[in-house]
Curated annotation (Swiss-Prot):
Function summary: N-acetyltaurine hydrolase catalyzes the hydrolysis of N-acetyltaurine into taurine and acetate.
Position of the signal peptide: none
The keyword Cytoplasm belongs to this UniProt entry's keyword annotation: yes
Subcellular location: Cytoplasm, Cytosol
EC annotation from Swiss-Prot or TrEMBL: 3.1.-.-
TM regions (residue ranges): none
Name of the protein in its database record: N-acetyltaurine hydrolase
Gene: pter
Organism: Dictyostelium discoideum
Gene Ontology molecular function: any one: zinc ion binding
Amino acid sequence: MTERIGKIQTIKGLIEKDELGITHMHEHIFINYLDYFEKPNEQELKMCCLGGGSGSGNSNSNKTIEDLSNEKISLINNHWVQYNYNKNLHNLQLNEMEIAIRELEMFKRNGGSTIVEVTTKGIGRDPLQCLKVSQELNINIVMGAGYYLDKSISQFVQSMTEKQMEDEIVKQCLIGIDDTSIKAGIIGEVGCSFPLTNNEKKSLIASAKAQQRTGLSISIHPGRSQTAPLEIIQILKDSGADLSRVIIGHIDRTIHDINILLETAKTGCILEFDLFGMEISHYPFGGEVGMPSDNQRIEWIYQLIKHGYGENIVISHDIYTKHRLVSYGGHGYSHILFNIIPRMKKFGYSDTDINNILINNPKRLLTIIK
């Protein structure tokens, strides 16, 4: 165990912390998100049926809802998929090795070094496929341990105790994920709904206990309420978690009130703005809550830095659907490096601010402390 202290656990093994480089702290390379598919309605079908005009032979007016759900992303349906990305089955799966390599080669070419792959139990985590990508491109990939939302894990954990879940998370970190010898280097993303379910509370407590045994950080997927992060933080604190190594993800779709944001930051946790590139304000999973723009994200992070929280911020894209990949007309894993960092510099971010967000904060969080 002592040989792990001060190092970072990647999919290929332990590395020195200075080998980490520029890091995206919340991404998915392979994932199956079909549990969260929502069937399109008749109105949406009409929107996506492009008539070809008399005699053109290009009409698709006979398209059915089933067709709309299953068709591949194209120029014709691209905007509809962006707006309703949870209603297309093809879009909800990242499962193509060739495309994964192509997309992450672009990330590497633009200066990226490490991807934290936080796909957990219940949504198609695939460490062996991720290992192939890491070996092919010689990039660091850090895998996640633990459990996703109740909807995806109830079949696995309903009859498990907190201790059994804790032991399973520890096993994924110290021995290997599933039937492999590939070890996780972070706990999470730990799925939380709002309100929390009993299984999710067990998962949170188990994750806090596992953190104490492994020396790893915890990455949280909070429920969609501005008060959800504070509730989760309290449960983790009561369970013995080190809050300075707890990352609250999806801040940008969760907290839109600066006072609540600052109250959350005061707990000492890490605030993760991980939806860069998501610029359509409609958020299918958010009810009445809209999705902010990248410019708003840049402004909020800047305000947090000015309040003294520059060492408590990490960023990412959280790509988990095809439409956000360059191969399907999206921004890809290089959007932050290619587009956002130059905008941050124009906004007034210092080199120190940017290095903290991309390199130093991830390095501190991923370094094993016990």
